[in-house]
Amino acid sequence: MGKRKANHTISGMNAASAQGQGAGYNEEFANENLTPAERQNNKKRKKNQ
């Protein structure tokens, strides 16, 4: 089927549908101001995607 687009590069509305409910939309905007604990969690999540 040709090359697949990497899901994590998509921003905006498409991110939620590509990554599953809650993954795209919530985490895109959570990056603005994270607590240290959230930042730790965010790094782990990004590696897994």
Swiss-Prot record:
Swiss-Prot/TrEMBL induction comment: Expressed only in the forespore compartment of sporulating cells.
Organism superkingdom: Bacteria
InterPro entries in UniProt: SASP_SspO
Biased composition (Polar residues): 8-20
Protein name as it appears in the record: Small, acid-soluble spore protein O
Keyword RNA-binding in annotation: no
Subcellular location: Spore core
One GO biological process term: sporulation resulting in formation of a cellular spore
Family, similarity comment: Belongs to the SspO family.
